[in-house]
């Protein structure tokens, strides 16, 4: 994997920086693990915009990724190849199990074709293996962490993502996330050893607006250049300031305002990610 700065043959390529991984599979994805993915463009069934700045972009299939990895315990597996996934920042790996079934998983850092993998409590502590947190040594770097046993990985799934297992106390373990938050997780929740691969993803430079549109992302218009009917910052004769503290189009404070409202799981957060 390497960062490649393109030659300035056009304005769009002048500042472009690409992540090149020669180990990725160049052919078609594994067809049985593909599903149709329809363009929703941020609209609901009424046609109303529910998520702004979405629309257009290249067509692509959804790759069915196994985030649970709990029904192949003890069955030896081998990484067949690494693939690009347009639906996420991390790369995925096509894994062949000894019983003949193939599945996609999130590729961990250092994973290569031909690597042996194992799921389950008896799996060795080696990058890419998946096992319950009760069987993982304290201090281990982990990724694809479950929040609820059997629900599937929900935390540390993006490119370069990871968490650290800090402690185990009774039925719960403490996990430190990249944000600095320390969270309690049941010891029967599963996690994968190591970090998520494609860690250089954050260093890429898109280079031009068109490449962002290929990804289905539409322009973000500043509220201060809108009309008053469209945004609280809008209006005024000529170029004017917002006239108030920054807010969203619906009046919610935009800078530093905490919006977490799930009090039911507050007891699972040992240390908040906020500094104060």
From Swiss-Prot:
GO BP term (any one): cytoplasmic translation
GO cellular component terms, semicolon-separated: large ribosomal subunit
Family matches, as InterPro entries: NA-bd_OB-fold, Rib_uL2_dom2, Ribosomal_uL2, Ribosomal_uL2_bac/org-type, Ribosomal_uL2_C, Ribosomal_uL2_CS, Ribosomal_uL2_dom3, Ribosomal_uL2_RNA-bd_dom
Pfam assignment, any one: Ribosomal_L2_C
Known role: One of the primary rRNA binding proteins. Required for association of the 30S and 50S subunits to form the 70S ribosome, for tRNA binding and peptide bond formation. It has been suggested to have peptidyltransferase activity; this is somewhat controversial. Makes several contacts with the 16S rRNA in the 70S ribosome.
Family: Belongs to the universal ribosomal protein uL2 family.
The name this protein goes by in its record: Large ribosomal subunit protein uL2
């Amino acid at each position: 994997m390497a960062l490649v700065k393109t030659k300035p043959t056009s304005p769009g390529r002048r500042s472009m920086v690409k992540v090149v991984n020669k180990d990725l599979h160049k052919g078609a994805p594994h067809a049985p693990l593909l599903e149709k993915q329809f363009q929703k463009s941020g609209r609901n069934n009424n046609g109303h915009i529910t998520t702004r700045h979405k629309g257009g972009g290249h067509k692509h299939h959804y790759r069915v990724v196994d985030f649970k990895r709990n029904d192949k315990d003890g069955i030896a597996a081998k990484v067949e190849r690494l693939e690009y996934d347009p639906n996420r920042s991390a790369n995925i790996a096509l894994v062949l199990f000894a019983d003949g079934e193939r599945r996609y998983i999130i590729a961990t850092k250092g994973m290569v074709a031909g690597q042996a993998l194992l799921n389950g409590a008896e799996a060795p502590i080696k990058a890419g293996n998946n096992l319950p947190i009760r069987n993982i040594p304290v201090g281990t770097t982990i990724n694809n962490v479950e929040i609820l046993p059997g629900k599937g990985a929900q935390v540390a799934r993006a490119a370069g993502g990871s968490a650290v297992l800090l402690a185990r106390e009774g039925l719960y373990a403490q996990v430190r996330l990249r944000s600095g938050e320390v969270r309690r997780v049941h010891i029967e929740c599963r996690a994968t050893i190591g970090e998520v691969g494609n860690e250089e993803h954050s260093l890429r430079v898109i280079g031009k607006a068109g490449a962002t549109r290929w990804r289905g992302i539409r322009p973000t218009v500043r509220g201060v250049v809108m009309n008053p009917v469209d945004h609280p910052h809008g209006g005024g004769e000529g170029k004017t300031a917002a006239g108030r503290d920054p807010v969203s189009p619906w009046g919610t404070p935009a800078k530093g305002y905490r919006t977490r409202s799930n009090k039911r799981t507050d007891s699972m957060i040992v240390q908040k990610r906020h500094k104060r």
